[in-house]
Amino acid sequence: MRGQVFTLQGQTYFTFGGASSHDIQDGILDPAAYAFGTQDPDFKVKRKYLDSMNAMYRIKGVSWWERELPNEQEMAEGLENLKKCGNKVDYIISHSPCTSDMFLMGGRGLYQPDIISNYLEEVRATTEYKKWYFGHMHLNKQVSMQDICLYEQILLVPGKDYIYQFPEMEDR
């Protein structure tokens, strides 16, 4: 479902998920053994050791997934969907930032440009938008007038003439 354009409350949104794991320098644990689908008998020992070393690792299927990055088809579909709406949306929502925002934020030595940030840079260069929200950097920071990194912050995105009304309760 990466690269889709949605209209919600009269506003258009381009969405594109995915990111490179930046905190896997010490490896990826696989709780399942490769042979016969049994559990890895040393999984708990390995995890305890990595935790004791304050290691940066992930667990396959729990905190890391093989498809964390988009494939060529998903990226092409995203660009095609933007083209269908004249390369103009109200909001962009992604997990990763585009490369230029990554540089503006400094990256803290953990984040490096990659296939997805470069793709999103292409989206930025070819798309007109009001605001872009992303969260991969785990910060609450306004990077530019249009681009905002969200982590623990929640924002209300105003819709056109949107007033939420609760359904009336029936007296019983």
Pin down the residues of each PLM region.
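Short acidic-hydrophobic surface loop/beta-edge motif
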Residues: 3-9, 142-144
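Conserved hydrophobic/aromatic beta-strand scaffold that supports enzyme active sites
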Residues: 3-5, 15, 161-163
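Active-site-proximal loop/helix segment associated with metal-binding centers of metalloenzymes
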Residues: 9-110
